[in-house]
Amino acid sequence: MKKTDDAVKIARYISEFLDVYAPNFLTTSEHTLKSYRNALGLYINFLETESVTLGNFARHCFEREKIEKWIVWLKESRNCSPETCNVRLGSLRVFLEFLGSKDIEYLYLYQEAQKIKRQKCTKKKVAGFTRDAVAAMLAVPDVSTKTGKRDLVFLTLLYVTAGRLDEIRSIKIRHLHLDGKKPYVNLIGKRDKIRTAYLLPKVVAYIKVYLSAFHDGTPDPDAYLFYSRAGGKYTKLSEPALAKRDKNMCRSSTQKVSGCPP
């Protein structure tokens, strides 16, 4: 195969991975999708520093030796931490796995990338919330408003389930089981892994008040618990908007009590 043919083929697969495959078959998390896009963008930037052009862009650009040079470049030229380098490498591996599934001639690239050792990371102590900080944060939403009711339930579920932002965003009505002896919610994680989180009576009461405000009548099992007002009940709330709102509420609670991580 000519190098130019190889270049066109790989470029087409990069676009297909970012625009079609990843958002439809890997994740709905905007953060993860952005991570894939950033990793591939940085890899292309690195290849340009290696004098790679359309004329010599080919499969050899994704071989182990080149990827290892990329990691060094990330550390030395981009000042990336070991943790960030590992995230970038993980994202590139996901693309190379996809590439190998599209054309068996590229499968060896993924197999080589799997052998690259991750960077050693220093374990960091995670700063948690104190009980007072949690109470202060849950007191921020104004429950006299619909938005306040939503924020309270969202924050409560985030805290009591220890779920990720996207797991809470992805809850549908059918994932809630509120009327049994032991009420629970099913959280759908990465690669569609299901995790069950049991709910206390007070949390169940919050959710039922929220349901009456946001899901009139008999809720559709396939509707999102937290949906976009613009997109409707079958469109989940955007991750950036929720993350920004959570930070603002945490900032407000920090003004009232110490113990909130910055």
Question: For each of these PLM feature ranges, what is it?
Answer:
Residues M1-P262:
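Conserved catalytic core of the tyrosine transesterase superfamily
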